[in-house]
Amino acid sequence: MSLLTHHHETEARRSTMLRTAFCPVVRRALEAPDTIEVMANPDGSVWIEKAGIGIVVSEHTLEASDRERVIRLVASGIAEAVGPHAPIVSAELPGSGERFEGLLPPVSTAPCFSIRKPATTPFELGDYVDQGALSPALCAALRDAARTRANILIAGGTSSGKTTFTNALLAEPTFDDDRIVILEDTRELRCAAPNTVQLRTHRGSVCLQQLVRSTLRLRPDRIIVGEVRGAEALDLLKAWNTGHPGGITTLHANSAYGALRRLEQLTLEATRRAPFDLIAEAIDVVVFMSRAGGQRRVEEALRVSGFDGESYVTEPLVSRSLSLVTQGDMT
């Protein structure tokens, strides 16, 4: 038996054991095609986010012992200790790759966890237009930005659709002829380009900043980072600005312009002064995603053209009249 076959069989067994440990309400929710995320709270309530609907509460609850068993089983599967001195478990579930976050006391009052399903049906930019989440003019402008190797920053709140939109951009044919290197904490991005390398951080040994630096030795044409959260932001900006344009990354922010200020804050984890000019030169386009209930849409897109000493010089990627959409039904 080859090592690869043995690994796949082990993953299959782990997946079966884990899903057996889930109570029926969690199993049914994960099996439902319209489920986006399942959340088990410390009080035992179970909340489910459904596509096009939003978050609803289940009529079923989970006992603390059941919630803790799930968390411990996930921790065991990734060979991590869990308990009062290590109460947080972050993992990718075996099999279908759901993103798992579990917490135990003392950081939570009782065991709780969240399971986010990966997108099973990839969306393309045209799908956003069809569902009223993106105007045709803005869609064309974003396609042109990707084609001309603009560096694109996608911002938004939690669960606003940043990853799904990144995947839609990566599905564009313009990426097919390039060598793409994708860096992530959890494997969520998909790129059909034939010359694609996907790398993932490893807790305690390999951080995102190290991966960005290592990537430069892999001869990338485009560098894609799932989400910047810290000092790696500075390394990525330098990479994009020194011969590796055409990248995409995401971060949490409350507006398109606010994403540039948030980027400043992240770079300050690696330097004493925010690199305003570097940010203005490296970031070409900022896309802001929003969510209201179960609806996600592209709320705003800016073109960045410089820094005037006090603020970033920006303008709408397309005129406001052309960027408006009548409805946002993107999930």
PLM regions: where:
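N-terminal anchoring/assembly modules that precede and organize ATP-driven motor systems
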Residues: 1-57
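Active-site phosphate-binding and catalytic loops of NTP-dependent enzymes
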Residues: 22-28, 74-93, 178, 270-276
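P-loop NTP-binding catalytic core
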Residues: 49, 55-148
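Conserved lysine of the Walker
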Residues: 162
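Hydrophobic anchor at the beta1->P-loop junction of P-loop NTPases
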Residues: 154-156
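Switch/coupling sub-region of P-loop NTPases
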Residues: 149-152, 168-282, 288-291
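Walker A (P-loop) phosphate-binding loop of P-loop NTPases
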Residues: 159
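Conserved P-loop NTPase
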Residues: 280-331
